[in-house]
Amino acid sequence: MHDRRVTTGFRGLDDILDGLRIGDNVVWKVDDIKDYRYFVEPFVKQALVERREIIYFRFGQHPPVVRADLDVETCELDPREGFEPFACAIHAIATAKGVGAFYVFDCLSELLSAWATDHMIANFFQVTCPYLFRLDTVAYFALLRNRHAHKTIARIRETTQVFLELHNRDGELFVHPLKVWERHSPTMFLPHRESGESFIPLANSLEATNLLAGAYSQDQAAGSRRLDHWHRLFLQAEDLKAKGVAAAEQEKMVAHLCRHLIGREDNILSLARRFFSLHDLLSYKARMIGTGFIGGKAVGMLLARRILEAQPDTEWRDLLEQHDSFFVGSNVYYSYIVNNGWWELYA
């Protein structure tokens, strides 16, 4: 029978947090993935000593955060298949493993390039974290600093049990607990400097202020990155159109936008790249509510219209009714399910 208390693998960090608890989801907000890896390895090694089953969800483009020579089961997933297949696959694996397994996830920021929107990362965490909690697991996650909207970070922080900011200042590591569920101490929520095997609280207000001010200035310098990835992508597309860049560069952007707006089926994407212009895709986005795919029937209608208009022998533009459709993005549908607490019925 395992104890409810779990070690991080760092005695000093255990002292700060009063250890981890069974059910904890631990989110690390980091500057660099190698800093996350530094804290993952001792956690994994100690869990193996305690004969825990550990599953590593591998889906990022960054180097693995768990060494291949450790006795850990690696489950490789492709987030480009979409939110639903990705979230359902993790749900199914966790269900099959049952109670008591431990999990390490690649950096969640990697999902941005696949899903194009912060909002769905928060949705993913909101459906995954509570389920792992009920299965008596301990799970490690990471987010890269300055890559996500404030609202996304807030939703993840609200959902998780433990949220830790990790600062690396010229190789010196500082851990700043922002949330530790159902635990408290007089110094728990101060920044702590790693010193040997210990973590020393920055009780000196000047030191703490300098550390946090440095992090704040980085946040301010990255102001444009506070925009959701989806909106940044379309701002880039609008900029390309306004500048009148070469056709090849516009075609590259069209292909990129199609993967986030039109769908994933190769035959449909091939037609979309052929018949849709950058102007077309930007006009469709302007008629969207939310983010995600506009839907198969809508894509079929738009493609059929463009194919007809491309015919040289008929003035279809004079015959067709004016286009007046609006679109509800697929992410609105998923968000409706998640926010109403119906995901497990759906999954």
Regions found by a protein language model. Give the residues of each.
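Nucleotide/phosphate-binding sheet-loop regions of phosphoryl- and nucleotidyl-transfer enzymes
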Residues: 200-347
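Conserved inter-motif catalytic segment of the P-loop NTP-binding fold
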Residues: 49-113
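Short, charged/polar "capping" segments at the starts of alpha-helices
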Residues: 36, 61-67, 148-151
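Structural recognition of the conserved hydrophobic beta-strand(s) that form the central parallel beta-sheet
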Residues: 28, 56, 104-106, 136-145
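Substrate-engagement module of ASCE P-loop NTPases
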Residues: 114-115, 120-147
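Conserved catalytic network of the ASCE P-loop NTPase/AAA+ motor domain
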Residues: 18-21, 46-50, 94-98, 130-136, ...
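Glycine-rich P-loop/Walker A and Walker A-like loops and their local beta1-loop-alpha1 context
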Residues: 5-61
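Phosphate-binding/switch region of NTP-binding enzymes
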Residues: 137, 143-197
